[in-house]
Amino acid sequence: MTFKRIITSLFALLLTLSAYSQSLIFGKVQDAFLKTPLPEAKVSVLLAADSTVVIDSIPVRKKHGSDGTVKAAEFIFKPERKTCKYLLHATLAGYEDAYQLLAIDENDQGAIMLDHPLGLRRIQERQLGEAMVTATRIKMFYKGDTLVYDARAFKLPDGSMLDELIRQMPGVTMNSNGVISVNGRRVDELQLGSRSFMRGNSKVLLENLPYYTVKHIKVYEQDTDLNRAMGAQLEKKRFVMDVNLKPEYQRGYIANVEAAGGTEERWLGRAFLLSFTDKTRYALSANSNNVNESRHIGGSNHWTPQSMPNSLLTTHSVKGEIDYQSSDKNVQENLNVDFISSRNEKEMSRRNELFVTGNPLNLSHQNSLGKENVLKLGNKFKYIKPARLMFDTDLAVDYKSYSGNSFMLSEQYVDSLTLRQRNVGLNDGSSWKMKFYAHYYPKLKDLENWRQFFWVKTFCDYQSDENQQAQRFHINNLVSPSDIKSHNANDYSNKKYFVRPLVHYCIDSKDTTYYAYIEAAPSFSRNQTKDWLYHPDTLLLPSELDMLQAITDPANSYNSDLRTYKGDYTFYFTRYQILPDEVWGGWPRELVELQLKLSSLRERLNYQRGSLDTLATRNTLLIDAAMRMHFYVRKNVQSPVHIAVGYRETETPLLNQIGYRDDATPLVVRLGNPNLKPYNSTCYIEMRHTDERSRRHHHLIDAGFSYNPIQVSQSVSFNPTSGVYTYRPENVSGSYYFSTGAKVLQRFGKNLCWTVDNLFNCNFRHSLDHTLLAGETESHVSAVNTFTVHDGGYIQYEKGGLNVRATADVRWRHSEGKMRDFETLNATDFNYGLSGRYTLPRLKTTFSAEGKMFSRRGYGSTGLNTDDFVLNASISQPFLKGKLVARLEAFDILHQLSSTQYEVNAQGRIETWYRSLPHYFMAHLIYHFNKNPKKGK
């Protein structure tokens, strides 16, 4: 014990001597009432201005007395700035957080001893009428360049899942597909404990992980396994959202079971199991429902009629995963199984008006039913030998069977009704997909001032699709009176093969200043298609017909065999910048990036269709060049400015350059164009600036411009006498697009209980289409200019169990055409509403409600210019200490919901209505349970 005291004293003496050149801060932490030392406490240093974390954890050392007992708990740290105001933050389980303000002046020399120890008070919850007094937690803070959300600071109703927690996090948005953005930047992957989950299927985790199991959610740029294995920055870091569980849920298992039933024959059942050992994670999810619903009453997402489900979907699914990771993360193995069975009913109405002579109008109504079964198997393996090599494989096998039927009624008008058509269809098919990737990354011997790396990758893909279709057409022409009935039957087969080896060589300066690589990736692909068309006298699939040769339509039956030899050659160079050591630890960040990719294509198409039997070849060189620059305001990684300039070419299908004619579908003719150019091209410039230095204020500004020297559009001609539309691809040049926007997040008030989030953007699109006007033989380029302005946001107040949010969103579109007889169009969509949630303190009963007015103006159909007030509400009650939750939900109580899409281009305007999920009430019963392993096991 004496020896330890001597070492401690010498250590303190050395630190004190070094303080003559730079100040050191000495402090103590203790129980505020008993004055006893608390060496287990965690002490952090924050900037007083915005609570940014400067030092996450300072070691707290025990100071022993002569009798061997602990007399004090001391900490020492060196301030990073000469003049600054800091906030010392101490935490310990069972105690309220303690804070102490510390002001440092550049004139301070030597050691500084805090006048008062950091005193922590034990948490004592006490009832004051209906109020419970507890410590207040900070919702979000920065730890280095990592944005950390403290899940314990969010007050959500019992039974809430991870998705509801994420929707409440400031600066975070999430759409119905589970795609998450933080301060306008899209998250690459949602992880659990810094590991991928269900092969990136975020919705499983979002909808099934109880929020009460979460401790922190961290958002940061994650280093890749390759960078870790090679000890160099060879790949760009990924922007991830990492869900960290509380310690008590990191072992054992977590399980949920939910059952629900409602009006309109709505029902739902699901179960979830998540189990952990030291190195292995097991996950199992089962779901059966006909709800197809992702709305959350009182949530932060601005849901609109356009984002409503556009079909009635019934789904049965089972997903399972076994994930192993060694303690040093050098061996990783993942096995994944996924089965989905679905039934999809869709109803759609469409109004399509063309901007050609006579303004022909097409009205259609369609009903369809599709069934699908999908089985997916996947296995990933990775082995890392640090500073030596990395090897990984990925195997995926998918099988799908599907069938369906459809009915469509369409009517064409030119001043009056000219044609009526009824279509009935059937289809049945199956497909296989197999993918195998293998990557080998050995590390080469270093050069004098450079590190060099080399790796080889292999990609192998195979796809097969077998499909049969049958259609019946009934056409009633009122201009040239006729009544025609016909039948089509298709036998379709497609096989695709793809092989791609890749060789990569790169060098990296040892001072982390320069990095460059060259990459060669030759590939071969083969796409074989057989599509035979028959004309029977009844509605049957080809497998049910006899004497197929006698009813074959040779002009619309074809065999296609496309072979593509491609070589991709990429050169990349970057110049790094090192941010100051005292702020960000000397991390390298890209300053300038240059990339040039050349793609050499040789295509060989053997195409036979009726009397057309041709062998077409094409040689194409494609260019993809880009320069990206990155700057940081005041060398701060949380305030970057990104600028990108580039030019990109992409190939067009070789089939478009074949002079074929396809009139298999009545009233529709499709033609090829031998004069079509073999590629599209785009020039672009983009700028983006974000500032996330403060937990109170974030902002984002972006702008972009793109110009298309070469594009492909579909020309269309309409014959009002026969009712036939003819489509042909044509090149156009000169379309462009400009956009700019800004996003601001501001938090204020006591305990930051107020949040304002606003997103503004506008864009201008100059759209060109090559249109053949009625009565003319040559194409004419038609232009439409569309200017769109959008602004949306919310203001929220949250304190304890109360959450109130007011939202507003408006989008205005103005379109002007350069062709004759174009009527200027103005369309406005706007909505505004109020949502609220309150939890009774004692009963923990939660009431949620949301009311929104959705309005539309300027649509061509008067039936779409409406005001719809949508009201939703729910009530939930926990039992058994929150393990059992009952919830009643009511959607669209006033029966106002609809789903409408609106589109304008140079050819016309299209308004589409989908049958959305009907209004309904639904009762849920949810049970959560977990079990931890016994101590000592």
Give the location of each predicted region.
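Short, acidic, small-residue-rich periplasmic hinge/interaction motif at the N-terminus
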Residues: 30, 44-46, 89-93, 111-155, ...
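Short acidic/polar hinge/loop motifs at secondary-structure boundaries
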Residues: 195-223, 278, 282
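Structured interaction patches on ligand/partner-binding surfaces of diverse proteins
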Residues: 95-114
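Short, acidic Ser/Thr/Gly-rich low-complexity loop/linker segments typical of extracellular
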Residues: 50-74
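Structural motif
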Residues: 28-39, 137
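Extracytoplasmic beta-strand/coil segments of soluble accessory domains associated
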Residues: 163-198, 216, 226-235
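Primarily recognizes Gram-negative and organellar outer-membrane beta-barrels
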Residues: 200-203, 223-265, 280-937
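A short, solvent-exposed loop/turn motif at the edges and junctions
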Residues: 51-53, 75-76, 83-101
